[in-house]
Structure formats: structure tokens, C-alpha cells
Amino acid sequence: MSLQRTGEHHIPIDADVVPSIGVDISNLPLDKTKTVQIKEVGGAMMPLWPTYLKGAAALMYVVDISDAYQLAASATAFHHLCGLPAMRDKRVLLVWNKTDAPCALRDAETAAFDAARAETALKDALTTIQVSALDGSNAEQVMTWIRGVYGV
């Protein structure tokens, strides 16, 4: 992601994204003076997730809704995270990714994820956004949410 002279973000889109395995750390510019560090922690690192949450300002949880086989596992991990003490008073963004994929799950199928249950656990600190990794649809909404977390 890069900040253009106009102040708008250019978000490069990679349609051949694979799941994270370890930890990927990126710096994300929010404006001309503020940059935040984003830590993408893969599912294989699940036992260490609570450690990363302790110092986090918020949680962004990305679900690949083109992968029906992983939805139940993603939901289980997400609900576990939402119940951790380290999540107390943290804002959470649930990102439904790859919504434009031909095999993307529809609303009736993603209802099994039970995001409403997480809203109760998080005391309404949950925001949900649907995005496309292919064309970048709604990526700016994600940036707006991140800026809101940091007061930018």
C-alpha cells in the first residue's frame, strides 16, 4: 500500500494470495505524519495469538469466503479470540474477503459463522466489511476503520 501525492492510498491487489503461515509485519501510513504497524499472524501461529493481542490496538480478522471448507475452523478461531481477556475493550474488524469469487459463500452460508455471537461478546465493538482481493472493492472502508482506531 502506498500513499499518493493526492493523499489517497494506492492499494496493490494480488489475486493469488495464499494464507499466512508465520508473521508478516508491515508499516501502513495513515496520513502524512502517522504510520502504524500491522502484524499479520497466520493460522499456524494460533497458540501465540493472545501474545500478539496484548499490545494490539485492535483486531482485523480476515475470512476467505471462497473457501467453504475453512469457514467452520475460521469461525471457531474467531470466537475463541473474541473471548480472550486480551480482547477486552478492543475494536474488531471482521473482513469477508474474496466476495466476488465465483465460489464465494453467500449470506445464508456465512450466517453459520455467527458474527452476532461475537458482537455480544465484544459489546458491539465489531464492524464487518466485505472486500474483494481481486479488484480492491471496499478496501478504502477498511482504511477508514483503521484510521478511526488511531484517531486519524
Q: Where are the language model's segments positioned?
A:
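TRAFAC-class small GTPase G-domain
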Residues: 1-152
